[in-house]
Amino acid sequence: MAPPSSIMATSSDVTTVKIILSMMKRTLALTALTLTSSACAYPSITEISDPPAVEVPMIQYELTWKCDDCTPEEQYVLEELQKHTKIKDRNALATILGNIKQESKFIPNICEGGARVSYTECKVGGYGLIQWTSIGRYKGLGNFCAKYVCDPSSLEGQTRWMINEPIFQRNLPVFEGHDQSISYYMKPAYYWLGWGIKGNREIYAYDYTKKMVLV
């Protein structure tokens, strides 16, 4: 009976060896796969020396004219003009500011003669930032604010009307030009405002150019 026991033991050993070899093959295969995957995770020498181009998004920042030495009212009008028109020329902006200063000193609720009253209480002469005088232009301010819900006595409401008023819009293309002198821009300013007395509006305009910086 001894020989059969020896044969069974040998067969068991062979089976064990086969199992071990199978497990080793599987382990080696997994190791090779892992190494291959790891190698693929790193760039090649060619990729390192000549990396692919990467498109960097461009962030556009538009420069605007600021006037730190101006009053809050002047700064507001300057900002709104640049926000709602294409006026880029400092001289053009300064000309508009100079004319407003001559007309009202940027006091929105001023009636011609100096009285500070609401829109409905100015009975004679011009009113507001640019001294709207004719019945059509004066009523235009009130009608605009009634339609677009703004205060016709306020700086905000009057600035909106000033920019949107048809007579300003007709002259706007000239103000939106470039590299012209203040004297040049005074012509469309006259067509816009139709002043009777020129006063210091051109001098004021030159003063603004000295205070305005592009940032």
Q: Where are the predicted features?
A:
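Low-acidity, Ser/Thr- and Arg-rich intrinsically disordered low-complexity segments
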Residues: 5-15, 22
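Bacterial N-terminal signal peptides that target proteins for export
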Residues: 20-28
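Sec-dependent N-terminal signal peptides
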Residues: 27-35
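Peptidoglycan-targeting cell-wall enzymes and recognition modules
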Residues: 52-81, 101-181
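Short, charged helix-capping/linker segments at alpha-helix termini
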Residues: 83-91
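Alpha-helical scaffolds flanking conserved acidic
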Residues: 90-97, 183-187
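Active-site or metal-binding loop neighborhoods of secreted/extracellular toxin and effector enzymes
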Residues: 177-215
